[in-house]
Amino acid sequence: AWVTSAHRAIQALNEKYGGGFYLFFRRPAFSAQDEKYMGWERKRGALTELVRLLKRKSTGLRTEVGEEDWLREVTYVITLDGDTSLNVGTAREMVGAMAHPLNQPVVDGQRRVVTSGHALFQPRVAVELEAANRSFFSRVYGGLGGVDPYGSTASDVYHDLFDQGTYTGKGIFQVEAFFTCLDGRFPENAILSHDLLEGSYLRAGLLGEVE
C-alpha cells in the first residue's frame, strides 16, 4: 500500500508542477556481515548507486516514477540528510560555485583523485531557530539557532590554509568526478563514516558564505 501511495504522491507533484519529481527504489542486498537484507553499503551505497544510474551503469537503483532520459543531463547532486533543509536560494548559490571556472575540478586519472579545483562543496551548516531550543541537548550543543548575518565573514582553518575543507554529508558534488574517483574505490563492509573520505578524494571546498 505504501508503494502505491508513494506513486500517487510523486505523480501528483509532477502533474502540479510540470514534472521534475522522481521516485527511486533500491534493490535489497544480503549482507553476510549483518545477516540480513539491506541497502547495499547503506548511505554510501545509495550515493554510489544513484551516480551509477545517472551514468547508465549497472545499479541496484530503479526508477519507479519519472523520465530516466532527463537524468542523463544531471551534472550536480545536492545531498541532504532527513533533518536538513535548504534556505531559499542556497541551491542556486551552490550550483553557481560549482560552475565557476576557477573551481572546475582537475582529476588525476591514474590516481583517481581531484588534484585542483573542487568536485564537492560543503556549505555552512547551522541549527534552525526552532530546533535550537527543542531539547536540553540541542540547547547545549546547537548554539544559537537561525541564520547568522555576521558569521559569514568567519574563516575556516582547513580551507584557508590548504584550499580544502571538510565534508559532513550535506553539500553538492559533480557527478562525473564522483564516478571517476569513487566508484569501486572502497572495500565493502568496511566503512560507515564515508563523508570525510569522499571529501578528501573530491577535494571538498567550503562555501562559508552559503548557509
Task: Name these PLM-found stretches.
Residues 1-211:
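Internal catalytic domains of large membrane-associated glycosyltransferases
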